[in-house]
Amino acid sequence: MPEVLMYSTRVCPYCVMAEKLLQKKGVLNLQKVLIDVDPSRREEMMTRTGRRTVPQIYIGDHHIGG
């Protein structure tokens, strides 16, 4: 399975729901990037996705949104 990356925050209820859905679908190795912990990663997310909201999810190189 390709790498799954999710830009998230520690307090985002939608991120929690997205993580639970991914786990239900069999994703065991979710890479979470907490943009509230590391502001430089927020800039990375906004540059990469063109969006400011979380969650933002990538499966491999494919952006599936949030």
What label would you give each PLM region?
Residues 1-31:
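Local sequence-structure signature of Cys/Sec-based thiol-disulfide redox active-site neighborhoods
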Residues 6, 45-46:
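Methionine-biased hydrophobic packing positions in alpha-helices, especially
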Residues 13, 40, 65:
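Short alpha-helical
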Residues 28-42:
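Thiol-based oxidoreductase modules, predominantly thioredoxin-like and allied folds used
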Residues 47-53:
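Thiol/disulfide oxidoreductase modules built on the thioredoxin-like
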Residues 59-66:
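Non-catalytic, surface beta->alpha helical segment in thiol-disulfide oxidoreductase systems
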